[in-house]
């Protein structure tokens, strides 16, 4: 059974105020005292089922599962063999978190227990001032979190909470929503449950004018303004990439938790949270898989305005199309082995996919710093106007992660699909056609 303490960690991660006198980054909390190659993702599917009660009050079904958890929390020890007794869970958790508070950080949440070992009905985090209701076995009750006062712990979770005077809003308007049935592993918790940061993003986006496009930059600015207000030390400020997107990795420095988010909305991705290390995140993960071209709508290419930009993109695609045709017709060319084309792809899409695979030497799904060099040489040699070349790679890297995905390459070249059709408006037909890959001669531009 999952320890309730783990359910509250992401909640508290959002509530903890940042340390004022020191700057942190995601790399600050990378684990350095353990073997970098240490694997905490053991497969325990076939392990013998012999329950163990750990020092934090959790029951592990096998020694393998315990070792997997201990890998992430070296302080964890085996208390005794067999299932943990429910009556002692609160006491065990309290003892464990008190030890954590002494050794790690003072802001850790420490539960309150009744004389019979069950959890007290009201639990509070003194460092942040938030209180909420729990069941006798420690499960948080949804919708009961309030700031700087004692919540009404209902017989029914649907009972209304007290309202602020004159506002008509409940006290938990800015508080995180708590769940009554937590499920999942420890590494899931910070992303599976709504964090205060998520709730803040939702709140700010709801206040945004419906006619305007919400972006990370706007949320970042709003968070900075909120942080200036009295008693708003718990505001979490999102990290932003270029183009109004969120950085794929978001972290809370005070606790060392990091998680992956959808770059267009900032919402956490379930199952991605880690502690004291950066998770591996998809730089293109989106809530709404948008047309790649939309990311570049209105995006300025420095030194290459309007008609010059159109001329430049046309020359790049024209040269790439010609190179693909020549590669396909030259048996000695290492790049001539073309994969079977997707029948739904237009010529320009086939060209971009072909060239992307050519550059992506390690098949990682993106073009890294070293792999991008041939593309830069290609642009300098075969495209015009030359003024458009200088900043084009930076223009393509819309999320500023120093690499280019196939979606970014298609988008910055203006060939992303829109309603099932490629964006080929106003563009001249490329000089060489990929029909030669089907044993047909390339059609010359008339």
UniProtKB/Swiss-Prot annotation:
Its main location: secreted. GO terms for cellular component: basement membrane; cell periphery; extracellular space. Glycans are attached at residues 206, 362. It comes from the Eukaryota. One of its GO terms (biological process) is positive regulation of DNA biosynthetic process. Residues 34-86 form the Kazal-like domain. It is found in: Secreted, Extracellular space, Extracellular matrix, Basement membrane. Disulfide bonds join 40-71, 44-64, 53-84, 90-113, 124-131, 133-153, 216-240, 251-258, 260-281. GO terms for molecular function: calcium ion binding; extracellular matrix binding; heparin binding. Keywords: Basement membrane, Calcium, Disulfide bond, Extracellular matrix, Glycoprotein, Metal-binding, Repeat, Secreted, Signal. Ca(2+) 1 binds at residues 360, 362, 364, 366, 371. This is SPARC-related modular calcium-binding protein 2. It comes from Homo sapiens (Human).
């Amino acid at each position: 059974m999952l320890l309730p303490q783990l359910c509250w960690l992401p909640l508290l991660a959002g509530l903890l105020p940042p340390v004022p006198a020191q700057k942190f980054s995601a790399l600050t909390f990378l684990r350095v005292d353990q073997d970098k190659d240490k694997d905490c993702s053991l497969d325990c599917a076939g392990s013998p089922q012999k329950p163990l009660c750990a020092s934090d009050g959790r029951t592990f079904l096998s020694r393998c599962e315990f070792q997997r958890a201990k890998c992430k929390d070296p302080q964890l020890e085996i208390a005794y063999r067999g299932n943990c007794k429910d009556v002692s869970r609160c006491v065990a958790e309290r003892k464990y978190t008190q030890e954590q508070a002494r050794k790690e950080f003072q802001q850790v949440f420490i539960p309150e227990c009744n004389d019979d070992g069950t959890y007290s009905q009201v639990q509070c985090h003194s460092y942040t001032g938030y209180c909420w209701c729990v069941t006798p076995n420690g499960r948080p009750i949804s919708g009961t979190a309030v700031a700087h006062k004692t919540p009404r712990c209902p017989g029914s979770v649907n009972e209304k909470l007290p309202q602020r005077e004159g506002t008509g809003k409940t006290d938990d308007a800015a508080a995180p929503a708590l769940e009554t049935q937590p499920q999942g592993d420890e590494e899931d918790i910070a992303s599976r449950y709504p964090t205060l940061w998520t709730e803040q993003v939702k709140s700010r986006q709801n206040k945004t004018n419906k006619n305007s496009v919400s972006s990370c930059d706007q949320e970042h600015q709003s968070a900075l303004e909120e942080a200036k207000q009295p008693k708003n030390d718990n505001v979490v400020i999102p990290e932003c990439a270029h183009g109004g997107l969120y950085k794929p990795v978001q972290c809370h420095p005070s606790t060392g938790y990091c998680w992956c988010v959808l770059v267009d909305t900032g919402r956490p991705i379930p199952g991605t949270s880690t502690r004291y290390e950066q998770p591996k995140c998809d730089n293109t993960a989106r809530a709404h898989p948008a047309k790649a071209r939309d990311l570049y709508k209105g995006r300025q290419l420095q030194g290459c305005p309007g008609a010059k930009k159109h001329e430049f993109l046309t020359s790049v695609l024209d040269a790439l199309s010609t190179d693909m045709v020549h590669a396909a017709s030259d048996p000695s060319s290492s790049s001539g082995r073309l994969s079977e084309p997707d029948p739904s792809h237009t010529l320009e899409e086939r060209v971009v996919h072909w060239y992307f695979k050519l550059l992506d030497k390690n098949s990682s799904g993106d073009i890294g710093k070293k792999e991008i060099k041939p593309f830069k040489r290609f642009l300098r040699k075969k495209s015009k106007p030359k003024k458009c070349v200088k900043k084009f790679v930076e223009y393509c890297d819309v999320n500023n992660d120093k690499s280019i995905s196939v979606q970014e390459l298609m988008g910055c070249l203006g060939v992303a699909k829109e309603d099932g059709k490629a964006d080929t408006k106003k563009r001249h037909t490329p000089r060489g056609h990929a029909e030669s890959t089907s044993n047909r001669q390339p059609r010359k531009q008339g």
